[in-house]
Amino acid sequence: MDIRMIATDMDGTLLDAQGQFDNNRFEKILDQLEERHIKFVVATGNEIGRMRKLFGQDLMERMTFVVANGARVFEGNSLLAEQHWDKALVQDVLAYFAGKERDYHLVANLHDGAYALEGMTFPMVEKFMTQEMAKE
């Protein structure tokens, strides 16, 4: 059986505890995967903007990204597919969680980033992200 694709999560998997990776080593690994015609896919709850900051333009163009927990798929920097909730469903969800946003750590994920109520904390996320990354 041939391996055609390798997919990985980011935080706590590809990235170390400081939210970083060895860029030179990773580029060599990508070279080897490309020689074998194996696609490398990043699957993450993060948005594409964070991926651009982490990988830079050159590496971005060599990978596929499934971001925002599957809401968008990019081949390099090109959007291939996007799925979103319709307005009525968003209104229903917001109404259901009204007043309980902090209890459930409600986050709205949009094209330009993720949004939560000011002052909300995310203890599990903070284990894998630095404060600077969480604020971006």
Explain the meaning of each model-derived region.
Residues D2-G19:
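Asp-based phosphoryl-transfer active-site loop
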Residues A17-Q18, M51-K53, G76-N77, E118:
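Short glycine-/acidic-enriched loop or helix-start segments at secondary-structure transitions
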Residues N24-H37, D92, Y96:
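Catalytic-core regions built around general acid/base machinery
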Residues L30-R52, N69, L106-L110:
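Substrate-recognition element of Asp-dependent hydrolases with the DxDx(T/V) motif
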Residues R50-M60:
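Metal-dependent catalytic neighborhoods of phosphoester/phosphodiester hydrolases
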Residues T64-V67:
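Short, small/acidic-rich helices and loops at N termini and domain boundaries
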Residues A71-E136:
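HAD-like small-molecule phosphatases
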